[in-house]
């Protein structure tokens, strides 16, 4: 089952937190559509800023958006011009007060979304799919990952019949719930159609904190 289920969804509430941190009853559908609109808008506006995770929190008439990015300077802009413009556009989109937090990704080679995005952009530039995957695997393992698996699927090299081809290095224990596995999929638009890119990165185990009990038990 661990091979089929989404690795992040399987671990939410165990070692992963939710990307949307709010609760609603009657307004649930409205908030969900608003979240989707916010994510779609940010991904479109900051397509070149290496944005990985977008976290959304809500309070009364206030939305807090946390952007995890490998290029915080590009998001902020000169004197904060870019982030101010983005905040204004999100205020207009939602009709609420939007606060933006920018969190820098220190090691982009350990982020599955950014690794997958890099492979997809190379495929669009006609780099050989085997070479793009192997280079990404080498960079990720050098960055300190315990394991990585990649897969590219579609009309590889313009073949008439679509197929999938992948590579892996190290270990990627998908069944282990305490394993910190980052997963992402991306799309590459080529002259022969779309290619799908999947990336799994194993970053080590997350062990639960031990609770101190009285009497040393």
UniProtKB/Swiss-Prot annotation:
Gene Ontology molecular function terms on file: mRNA binding; rRNA binding; structural constituent of ribosome
Xref: PROSITE patterns: KH_TYPE_2, RIBOSOMAL_S3
UniProt keywords, alphabetically: Ribonucleoprotein, Ribosomal protein, RNA-binding, rRNA-binding
InterPro entries with a match to the protein in the record: KH_dom, KH_dom-like_a/b, KH_dom_type_2, KH_sf_prok-type, Ribosomal_S3_C_sf, Ribosomal_uS3_bac-typ, Ribosomal_uS3_C, Ribosomal_uS3_CS
Statement: the UniProt record of this protein carries the keyword Ribonucleoprotein: yes
Domain KH type-2: 38-106
Protein name (database record): Small ribosomal subunit protein uS3
Originating species: Streptococcus pyogenes serotype M1
């Amino acid at each position: 089952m661990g091979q089929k289920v989404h690795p992040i969804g399987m671990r939410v509430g165990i070692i992963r937190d939710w990307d949307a941190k709010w609760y609603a009853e009657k307004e649930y559908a409205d908030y969900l559509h608003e979240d989707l609109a916010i994510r779609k808008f940010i991904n479109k506006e900051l397509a070149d800023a290496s944005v990985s995770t977008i976290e959304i929190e809500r309070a009364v008439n206030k939305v807090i958006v946390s952007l995890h990015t490998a290029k915080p300077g590009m998001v902020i802009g000169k004197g904060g011009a870019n982030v101010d413009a983005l905040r204004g556009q999100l205020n207009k989109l939602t009709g609420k007060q939007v606060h933006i937090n920018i969190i820098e990704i220190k090691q982009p080679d350990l982020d599955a979304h950014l690794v997958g995005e890099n492979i997809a952009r190379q495929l669009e530039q006609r780099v050989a799919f085997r070479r793009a995957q192997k280079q990404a695997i080498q960079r990720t393992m050098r960055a300190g990952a315990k394991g990585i698996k990649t897969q590219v699927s579609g009309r590889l090299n313009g073949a008439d019949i679509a197929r999938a081809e992948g590579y892996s290095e190290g270990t990627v224990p998908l069944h282990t719930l305490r394993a910190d596995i980052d997963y992402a999929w991306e799309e590459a638009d080529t002259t022969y159609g779309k290619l799908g890119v999947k990336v799994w990165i194993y970053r080590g185990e997350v062990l639960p904190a031990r609770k101190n009990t009285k009497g040393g038990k």
